[in-house]
Amino acid sequence: MAIRVELLLAMVLLPLLLLESVVPHAAAEKVWVDRDNVYCGHLDCTRVATFKGERFCTLCDTRHFCECKETREPLPYMYACPGTEPCQSSDRLGSCSKSMHDVLCDRIDQAFLEQ
């Protein structure tokens, strides 16, 4: 009886093991995070703030980044907007639109997202 059970297990498990060795695991696809787009989804290129030589977003973006979580990287536009009024509601491109999404805020310190 024990031999039959072992043979039955071998018949079931062997094809699975062979299939596993023939078909490689699908590698997780790495998707590059376009940080410029994440940070500055609504850029007014006539008034781009700079910090240590790097370009950053307008006040229009700062209004929306105030809603986002703080990251490990100290970004000048991640601080809370002063007072209770929004920093700015429009610029020369029109009304501000939310340009930073929570799912990217959570992972903004990563260069790639694995999908």
From Swiss-Prot:
Keywords on record: Behavior, Secreted, Signal
Keyword Secreted among record annotations: yes
Signal peptide interval: 1-28
Tissues in which the UniProt entry reports expression: Female saliva (at protein level). Distal-lateral lobes of female salivary gland (at protein level). Not detected in male salivary gland (at protein level).
Subcellular location: Secreted
UniProt keyword annotation of Secreted present: yes
Main location: secreted
Inactivation phenotype: RNAi-mediated knockdown results in increased probing time and slightly lower rates of successful blood feeding.
Domain of life of the native organism: Eukaryota
One cellular component term from this protein's GO annotations in UniProt: extracellular region
Function: Required for efficient probing and blood feeding.
Further information: Immunogenic; elicits antibody response in individuals exposed to Anopheles mosquito bites. May serve as a marker for evaluating exposure to Anopheles gambiae bites.
Record protein name field: Salivary protein gSG6
Organism of derivation: Anopheles gambiae
